[in-house]
Amino acid sequence: GLVGALFAGGLSVAEVIAYPTWSWDCVWYHLTQSRLIVQEGTIHYWFGPADGSGPLIYANGYPRLVETFTAFHLLVLRSEALVSAGQLGWGLVGAGVVVAWGRRLGIPRPTALLLGAGFLLVPAVFLQLHTTHADVATGSQTLALAYLVFAPKVSRAVFVAAVAVAGGLVA
């Protein structure tokens, strides 16, 4: 399990480095938003004219979190070398949350680690980890939200911090 997860992660990193974004929806939906963020100089590009004549209005109905990470890569590197890396970190978050769920449910640490590694081997995760899709990020965030919501006791400070982070990601 752990060797497979390392292989999956390594292969995804290699694909991010070696190949450009190529799938149709990555290029026409997700990468378009990232480029608009850079072109317009703001993440609020979707607030165009009321008549809908803003740039590429069709891109306005899609998630923006991974696209914002991709725009960050474009701005910092001034290249498209890592535009497909926007979900790699979210894959690790998802694996970590699976480990945390396992520990909360009383599963021994080594088994919980294997389950977390197994998260990276789920076909929907493995096949999209190196793309600009938003599915791995959304799945990881959903697992993390459920972990917090169903916590036996959550301190007020942790709850307020989680709401602040979620609000910052949505804004």
Short names for language-model regions:
Residues 1-12:
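Start-transfer (signal-anchor) and selected internal transmembrane alpha helices
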Residues 104-106, 145-159:
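Membrane-interface transmembrane helices that cradle and orient dolichyl/undecaprenyl
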Residues 66, 70-77, 83-97, 109, ...:
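Transmembrane alpha-helices of multi-pass, membrane-embedded glycan-processing enzymes
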Residues 19-33, 39-69, 78-81:
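Extracytoplasmic catalytic/substrate-binding loops of multi-pass membrane glycan-assembly enzymes
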Residues 81-82, 98-121, 140:
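Transmembrane-helix signature of polytopic, membrane-embedded enzymes
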Residues 115-120, 149, 157-171:
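Membrane-interface alpha helices of multi-pass inner-membrane proteins
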Residues 17, 76, 105, 121, ...:
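Transmembrane helix irregularities
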Residues 127-137:
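Short acidic/glycine- and proline-prone juxtamembrane loop motifs at membrane-interface regions
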